[in-house]
Amino acid sequence: MKALQKTAISAAAVALLTGLTSVAAFAEEAAAPEVSPVTANVTVASSYIYRGITQSNNKPAIQGGFDYAHESGFYVGNWNSSISWISDSYNAVSTPVKSAPSTSAPIEMDFYAGFKKELIGEGFASDFGVLQYYYPTTGLGGIQSKAWVTANPSLRQTSGVNPSTTELYAAQNFTFGAVTGFGKFSYAVSNLFGLQNSAGSFYPDLTANYDTGMYGITVNAHVGYQYVPNNVVTTVALAGAGNGGTWNASYADWKLGLTKDFGGGLSGSAYYTGTSAQKVGSTYVYATPNGGNAGRGNAVVALTKTF
């Protein structure tokens, strides 16, 4: 009887300890914070480069956005950046041709929605969506260099061109050990950033990132090709090809750089970008207000905080 009683007590003790362990484990799991479906980010960069073309005339930019991702895979988001290329197009020369619309604002506002899910396996998320680039302005005066506008003031288009753009996109993410990245295809269903007759432009690109496993450093590489149909006839084209002329606005771009994870949602990046954007005569297809190459090689540094 004593032996049986001892065994019963031991069994009870084991059950009690097991129960306490389970409760402790449950409490630990319950204490783990839930992953929020809402994230935010803010970036300070030495320049805003998009598809190899400067959007801030090689000057600093501040950027930020919000994202909501549902567990089903659907998501929506907004991203914004300071820019100068719209106001630069008006300020290229002196009055009277520089007068920008009073409702213009030095900002780009992007709105997007889509569906992202690992449809073909872990680490291989497929992504489909629509992206609206919105620029608060009553009209774009053309992306013309100061030299050309000075020589052809009567041909300058000072309003009426809408730079806002709508794109559809499809992307396939991949993971191969320490290498991650994605291939993406973007298609413009509207004119592309104010370029006339450019609906149907598309941009295939490939991005790859290699986690070195040292000091939180990742190597980043990117290549893309901006195709613009019809050699786009624009007021800008007149600059290098004569009245009624055309030029080739298509080009390739690339980027190579490093990203450093500092922890706590803080990261820094440094990279170099370049393009094959063409020159027509003495005029660049994508020109800065003073006639420089907006697609020239650029070194950029940035600091990003995610929340």
Locate each region found by the language model.
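Outer-membrane beta-barrel "beta-signal"
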Residues: 260, 291-307
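Cleavable N-terminal export/targeting peptides
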Residues: 1-35
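Transmembrane beta-strands of outer-membrane beta-barrel pores
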Residues: 44-50, 70, 80-84, 117, ...
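Structural signature of outer-membrane beta-barrel channels/translocons
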Residues: 67-73, 114-120, 173-177, 209-213, ...
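Detector for outer-membrane/organellar transmembrane beta-barrel domains
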Residues: 161-246, 251, 306
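Repeated loop/turn-to-beta-strand initiation elements of outer-membrane beta-barrel proteins
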Residues: 72-78, 121-126, 177-183, 214-220, ...
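Residues that define the transmembrane beta-barrel architecture of outer-membrane proteins
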Residues: 36, 58-62, 105-109, 124, ...
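Outer-membrane pore/translocation modules
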Residues: 87-89, 93-199
